[in-house]
Amino acid sequence: MASQGTKRSYEQMETGGERQNATEIRASVGGMVGGIGRFYIQMCTELKLSDYEGRLIQNSITIERMVLSAFDERRNKYLEEHPSAGKDPKKTGGPIYKKRDGKWMRELILYDKEEIRRIWRQANNGEDATAGLTHLMIWHSNLNDATYQRTRALVRTGMDPRMCSLMQGSTLPRRSGAAGAAVKGVGTMVMELIRMIKRGINDRNFWRGENGRRTRIAYERMCNILKGKFQTAAQRAMMDQVRESRNPGNAEIEDLIFLARSALILRGSVAHKSCLPACVYGLVVASGYDFEREGYSLVGIDPFRLLQNSQVFSLIRPNENPAHKSQLVWMACHSAAFEDLRVSSFIRGTKVVPRGQLSTRGVQIASNENMETMDSSTLELRSKYWAIRTRSGGNTNQQRASAGQISVQPTFSVQRNLPFEKATIMAAFTGNTEGRTSDMRTEIIRMMESARPEDVSFQGRGVFELSDEKATNPIVPSFDMSNEGSYFFGDNAEEYDN
């Protein structure tokens, strides 16, 4: 994608930095993950967790959620103004799992948010370190993307459940900033905009007055974020129409759904970052590694290397398959929920199976689940190769569309074709090409029709040996061209419920 001079790399978005050179970026991202690690170590001390308990991913998630909740200004303000029964607005907590006499026990802890904020700032040189918080949000979002389906949310906004590959980042909180916006899929942005437009249709005052002015600014900003994800002129022109609409209504919703469908073939640019659980950074910091001095990148070899050398455990329910649990977390760590399974399998070095075939539920354990029968096992998060994460949709040629398959948004910059069922996608585009966006619609449909499923994306890009940290010898895998690799195929996962 032709990058404008003003574009910042994701690492800059991630660290809130202005333009920096590669070394500065690596140092500031290193500082960010180092701060997360220091915070985690301190929390383990506070909670008196053993080494094993500190490596338990469920404990990591509870600690991450506590710090996110402690810094959630808007919600904290809301909780103070609307006191609800049994919720202390000044406290945060969750389940911590400890091993007693060979059995796992659940212990509910409560902390002052103020205290958590103090520990976090102390670990981050006295600063709020919002970038680190966003990083944790993206890790949780990637975990949700790999674990749950969003069929219901898609249907509610009038979209087709088969468009799930466009839903990356759909559970990210609004406050996740530029780094969060970069990882949101086209479908996620479309859904946020449709919800906004629907509120405007139902509530006469939504766009009016001082509040309405702020709403309008937010609407236009979201439109611009979505526009920036599209790579063809016609899609961008349609976004301009949606943004400039005087009074957004059903016509805009139609246009947005049309654009979302078109993104199945004319894919948008969506960033991918390997965000790891806090306990992984904690382990590495505890071993004496200096992230800031060594530098770190979310899109290169570094996360692979960390996972190669860290042992993380997970609680396992009686009928779950530990290998499947590992696959789920591996995909979340690399933000690969929407990647082609052929590519993921090749990089991981073991077969990555569609979600419908996984014998595992989510990573988090509900408060009513029986701990008596819980076991724990090591998560296998290592890989055979590493590959560079991409922020492009893998379209073969800037203006011409490439093939896309219902359910792929590439994560790794690795050569492959993106098989798709053209008939299925094109069937959605019959009829309506009239109205003010008719010429753009016609142009978009023309580009989609010329797309070929056998076209190769990421020409010449390959994976690398884990010893090849400078990425000098790409190994270009050859894939069975017909075999399609959708993770969500034949899906039976549970829905994401807040």
Curated annotation (Swiss-Prot):
<dbReference type="GO" id="GO:0019013">
    <property type="term" value="C:viral nucleocapsid"/>
</dbReference>
<comment type="subunit">
    <text>Homomultimerizes to form the nucleocapsid. May bind host exportin-1/XPO1. Binds to viral genomic RNA. Protein-RNA contacts are mediated by a combination of electrostatic interactions between positively charged residues and the phosphate backbone and planar interactions between aromatic side chains and bases.</text>
</comment>
<keyword id="KW-0167">Capsid protein</keyword>
<keyword id="KW-1160">Virus entry into host cell</keyword>
<protein>
    <recommendedName>
        <fullName>Nucleoprotein</fullName>
    </recommendedName>
</protein>
<dbReference type="GO" id="GO:0005198">
    <property type="term" value="F:structural molecule activity"/>
</dbReference>
<keyword id="KW-0945">Host-virus interaction</keyword>
<dbReference type="GO" id="GO:0043657">
    <property type="term" value="C:host cell"/>
</dbReference>
<keyword id="KW-0946">Virion</keyword>
<comment type="function">
    <text>Encapsidates the negative strand viral RNA, protecting it from nucleases. The encapsidated genomic RNA is termed the ribonucleoprotein (RNP) and serves as template for transcription and replication. The RNP needs to be localized in the host nucleus to start an infectious cycle, but is too large to diffuse through the nuclear pore complex. NP comprises at least 2 nuclear localization signals that are responsible for the active RNP import into the nucleus through cellular importin alpha/beta pathway.</text>
</comment>
<dbReference type="GO" id="GO:0042025">
    <property type="term" value="C:host cell nucleus"/>
</dbReference>
<dbReference type="GO" id="GO:1990904">
    <property type="term" value="C:ribonucleoprotein complex"/>
</dbReference>
<dbReference type="GO" id="GO:0019029">
    <property type="term" value="C:helical viral capsid"/>
</dbReference>
<keyword id="KW-1139">Helical capsid protein</keyword>
<feature type="short sequence motif" description="Unconventional nuclear localization signal">
    <location>
        <begin position="1"/>
        <end position="18"/>
    </location>
</feature>
<keyword id="KW-0543">Viral nucleoprotein</keyword>
<dbReference type="GO" id="GO:0003723">
    <property type="term" value="F:RNA binding"/>
</dbReference>
<keyword id="KW-1048">Host nucleus</keyword>
<keyword id="KW-0687">Ribonucleoprotein</keyword>
<feature type="short sequence motif" description="Bipartite nuclear localization signal">
    <location>
        <begin position="198"/>
        <end position="216"/>
    </location>
</feature>
<keyword id="KW-0694">RNA-binding</keyword>
<dbReference type="GO" id="GO:0075732">
    <property type="term" value="P:viral penetration into host nucleus"/>
</dbReference>
<dbReference type="GO" id="GO:0046718">
    <property type="term" value="P:symbiont entry into host cell"/>
</dbReference>
<dbReference type="Pfam" id="PF00506">
    <property type="entry name" value="Flu_NP"/>
</dbReference>
<keyword id="KW-1163">Viral penetration into host nucleus</keyword>
<comment type="similarity">
    <text>Belongs to the influenza viruses nucleoprotein family.</text>
</comment>
<dbReference type="InterPro" id="IPR002141">
    <property type="entry name" value="Flu_NP"/>
</dbReference>
<feature type="region of interest" description="Disordered">
    <location>
        <begin position="1"/>
        <end position="21"/>
    </location>
</feature>
